[in-house]
Swiss-Prot record:
It comes from the Bacteria. Belongs to the class-II aminoacyl-tRNA synthetase family. HisZ subfamily. This is ATP phosphoribosyltransferase regulatory subunit. Its main location: cytoplasm. Required for the first step of histidine biosynthesis. May allow the feedback regulation of ATP phosphoribosyltransferase activity by histidine. PANTHER family: HISTIDINE--TRNA LIGASE, HISTIDYL-TRNA SYNTHETASE. It is found in: Cytoplasm. This function is generally fulfilled by the C-terminal part of HisG, which is missing in some bacteria such as this one. InterPro entries: aa-tRNA-synth_II/BPL/LPL (IPR045864), HisRS-like_core (IPR041715), HisRS/HisZ (IPR004516), HisZ (IPR004517). Heteromultimer composed of HisG and HisZ subunits.
Length: 387
């Protein structure tokens, strides 16, 4: 085995891309800060009980597991930061009102995930705890849209659904977990024939409603159709009212909102509105999120919660190559005036690379497009000839 090889779907981030990732990470955290979201840095590793309990089987499978050499207990390397922020809100901060948290950190997954098909995505996200109303769902989605605009994505499509509709339809259906999973899979693939076949033993009205979910997709007008075709229960009608409020709450933004009532991503994890952001020319969701009101229960407090996250490395790898800004080359001369100019330029945010003895043959590798030269006794910056 060659010592420089990395595991599959694990890779280095080289200087140009790393600089862009870090610049955007800072910009996103600054965006979250001015919206009142407090930055937290959860640990890379925790006991498995806190990382995956209450989140569902999928996250357990995605988590790398190790044995703690100090205690002998099973630990996991985080595959998702959301459960960690839920723990911080419920157990560490213990606020009674609304808490807004944000984060930016790498996660490790057993299988590749996200736009870049990486097992080590860089998750950046925001979570809002302590408010159950649709207003907080709207706030989080608006923040997600601003975040994607910040990284340079303009033409956005927001796909919105509500897992509570499917859950409400099955609430009194009396079906087993296996049949529920099969219905879920059929709806995800919009296979209406499979839905009807799987639901033969259900109440005819329930089956008709489940089948209609595969057709209820489109702009905000589809919610009016849904209100007529779905049962007139308070839970379902309230879910539709909440979705309509989301459409109105995003109406002033330059995005296209689509409602897809068969979209049930995270059904066993989310408890209400779910959403994902797409952009023209990009395969797969750029960011996703939703409401997950029960996750904090395992930590002692089941607080209302909603949030979103994006894989910043994946997003950056999909963006057009950025134009690089060259550095300024400074000769290796012991001159107080030169040192003063170099430090002044650096204080302004300019990149100045001071030459070192013996490096003349390699100056072209520095990427400098300007050079400090002495003219009339003063050091000035001019366009660099071939170094």
């Amino acid at each position: 085995m060659r010592n420089w090889l990395l595991p599959e779907y694990i890779e280095d981030v080289l200087p140009a891309e790393a600089a862009r990732v870090e610049q955007l990470r800072r910009s996103l955290l600054d965006l979250f800060k001015v919206h009142g979201y407090l930055y937290v840095i959860p640990p890379m590793m925790e006991y498995m009980e806190s990382l995956t309990t209450g989140i569902g089987h999928d996250l357990d499978i995605a988590t790398f597991k190790v044995v703690d050499q100090l205690t002998g207990k099973l630990m996991g390397i985080r595959a998702d930061i959301t459960p960690q922020t839920a723990r911080i809100d419920a157990h560490m901060l213990n606020n009674q009102g609304v808490t807004r948290l944000c984060y930016a950190g790498s996660v490790l997954r057993t299988s590749p995930d996200g736009l870049a098909r990486s097992r080590e995505p860089l998750h950046v996200g925001a979570e809002l705890y302590g408010h159950a109303g649709v207003e907080s769902d709207i706030e989080i989605q608006r923040l997600m849209i601003k975040a994607l605009h910040t990284v340079g994505l303009d033409t956005l499509y927001i796909d919105v659904s509500h897992v509570g509709i499917f859950a409400s339809l099955l609430e009194h259906a009396g079906i087993g977990e296996a049949q529920e999973q099969e219905l879920y899979a059929a709806l995800q693939s919009k296979d209406q024939a499979a839905v009807r076949a799987l639901g033969r033993g259900l109440n005819p009205d329930t089956l008709e409603a489940l089948s209609s979910l595969t057709e209820l997709s489109g702009d905000i007008s589809v919610l009016e159709q849904a209100a007529k075709r779905l049962p007139q229960t308070e839970k379902i009608q309230q879910a539709l009212r909440d979705l309509k409020a989301v459409g109105a709450g995003l109406d002033d933004l330059d995005v296209k909102v689509c409602f897809d009532l068969a979209e049930l991503r995270g059904y066993h994890y989310h408890s209400g509105i779910v959403f994902a952001a797409y952009a023209q020319g990009y395969a797969g969701p750029l960011a996703r999120g939703g409401r997950y009101d029960e996750v904090g229960a395992i930590f002692g407090r089941a607080r209302p919660a909603t949030g979103f996250s994006l894989d910043l490395r994946g997003v950056v790898s999909s963006l057009p190559v950025a134009e690089t800004v060259g550095a300024i080359f400074a000769p290796a001369i012991a001159d107080d005036a030169l040192i003063f100019v170099v430090e002044s330029l650096r204080a302004q945010g300019q990149v100045v690379i001071q030459d070192l003895p013996g490096q003349e043959p390699y100056r072209a590798e520095l990427g400098c497009d300007r050079i400090l030269v002495q003219q009339n006794g003063e050091w000035v910056v001019v366009a660099a000839p071939e170094l």
